[in-house]
Amino acid sequence: LSGKSLQEEATMDFDLPSDLVAYLAELDAFIEAKIKPLQARDDNERFFDHRREHARTDWDNNGLPRKAWEALLAKARKLADDAGHLRYAWPPEMGGKGGTQLAMAVIREHLAAKGLGLFNDLQTEHSIVGNNPFILMFKEFATNAQYERDGEKLLGGKMRTGFGLTEPNHGSDATFMETTAVRQDKDGEPGWLIRGEKMWTTGMHVATHVMVFARTSGKDGDATGITCFIVPADSPGVKIEEYMWTFNMPTDHPRVSFTDVWIPKDSYWGQIDRGLGLGQSFVHQNRIRQAASSLGAAQFCVDESVKYARERKPFGKALSENQAIQWPLVELQTQCEMLRLLIRKTAWQMDRMEHKEIERTISDKVSMCNYWANRLVCEAADRAMQVHGGMGYSRHKPFEHIYRHHRRYRITEGSEEIQIRKVAAYLFGYAGPKRAQFKDQAGA
């Protein structure tokens, strides 16, 4: 074939869509015009410089976020919403722009690569381009009656939901949860009685409701028989037992008990006994976006280290001339480049598949992206601390904050071990596309 023919036949294109490139520039302009001035006012820099952990954390109130910190985040979200950015990923029929998986992955990387700032706070997962999986979860699984009942409140921010899936004794093995819900009438009204405990119940300090996953039928280990209930946070029997203090503070993750909590019969989302699928429905979306954020933060650490190594001149010679400095950063940059391509390819493929097809065919790729990105950013932050020396270890640089925050994602969003197990299942044909192939070979 001639060169021209090869060009005509080519189908591989690594260029980002032009409208996405333009949107990144639009976001950058918005940050410069609106977000940075807000961050610079009223000593708001205290939430991002060396004072950040204390400025954000109310140590005398269970380690919860200070009200001033949450108020600042709310102001930034309002500016973003007014400018049309906050709901970018929402479906158009829900007031959004229908942002694709590829676009969201690129945006998350782009913002995280800028470092710490009001435009995209790592710790709270606040961003001027909102993620909010509950919106898409609700759209996908809510019945017409549920949508009519809760849709306007949820979209308008009047309904804020905590998330209760993990339990003190059950994390990765969610199908063994001990929380139960049984049908029980109260004063002649049919309903449910919930008993159990949940752990790391995100957002309970501001929640109006909490999503409680409880077993309604079946036995331990069954994926079916679990229902997602929507419980008013002020229901009798709902009690925040303690807020769990973590490596990176403040916290909004309590242990919550549910003691004979009664709710009306229609207080659930999705279908009875099919709630676990709701809880896991957007796990791929969350994991690919989290991978992109970790990649962006890793790239920031590498870029800052390279810049510093060129500027710092001990003994009259730039650090960057030393192979002991060069080689670890070369390794990290190589991983960033490879991971970026896999994340974008996987996100692009996700845009062309229904959820069930993603699970059947490329769930392992999502796990590859997620576990490796979260490991990579920890390595990059640690290396940045080393390159920057004493200042790198101090809180006057952001690397310790990046490390402390992203270290959690090697446990949450599916632990590193669970992700690797998923990849292994696909690789060895215990799940995924190779399963039938290996089964046929075994039969032969």
What does each of the following model-derived ranges do?
Residues 181-183:
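A structural signal for short hydrophobic beta-strand segments in well-ordered beta-sheet cores
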Residues 260-278:
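Long, acidic (Asp/Glu-rich), low-complexity accessory segments flanking structured domains
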Residues 122-145, 171:
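N-terminal glycine-rich flavin-associated loop
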Residues 234-262:
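Flexible, small-/acidic-enriched active-site or ligand-binding loops
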Residues 12-118, 141-146, 153-157, 186-187, ...:
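Alpha-helical interface subdomain recognition
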Residues 1-11:
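Short, Lys/Arg-enriched N-terminal segments with co-localized hydrophobic residues
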Residues 157-165:
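A short, Trp-centered hydrophobic/proline-enriched beta-strand micro-motif
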Residues 139, 190-240:
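A short core secondary-structure module
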